[in-house]
Amino acid sequence: MSPGSGSSSVTIGSAGTIDPMPSAVLATGRAPRDTSPMSFATSLTNHFLIAMPGLDDPNFSRTVTYVCEHTEQGAMGIVINRPMDIKLGEVLEQLDIEPSVAGVSDAQVFLGGPVQTDRGFVIHSGPTEYDSTLTVTADLRVTTSKDVLEAIAAGQGPAQCLVALGYAGWGGGQLEQELSANAWLSGPADAQILFSKPVGERWLAAARL
């Protein structure tokens, strides 16, 4: 589902593992360019990327991105402070899921990034794994399969979760170059900021970690 659109369909429910970069695209949504990547030193998996004030890309200005995976081949993250104009109830309706718990339909949906904005991602607490779950840490996972939303709608889902459409992706070496150019501040992820902190406070809170 595209931001502000009620007619596009949401894609969630494919089984198997998550492909961190399904289309080998960058965070901008363009094909990778030859960047002569820097050497890979430290993985930022389970870290926040906090956009620096000078980052004027409209896709990432004043954003906080949760890095789900970061290897020599590239990185994938979900923006956690860009609420969309839709609620979870609209996503559930498109997937023919009937919520049986009060309040579920009112949960916020976030724009996770500019790539594949019709694809759903759920960042959630553990330990349950679903049909298509990437285990990030012992306590945090990312799931793209429909069964996690069915569990949430039935009141049997994870204790904490964040639902997003789309993701941010970086080709090999690109994120390292952006960090060297001071586009991002990085810091360890914090579950309270990820799930509980008011959206408007997440950028400053993450920057203070």
Regions from the PLM with identified roles:
Residues 37-163, 168-209:
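A short aromatic-anchored loop/beta-hairpin motif
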Residues 2-14, 23, 30, 36:
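Low-acidity, Ser/Thr- and Arg-rich intrinsically disordered low-complexity segments
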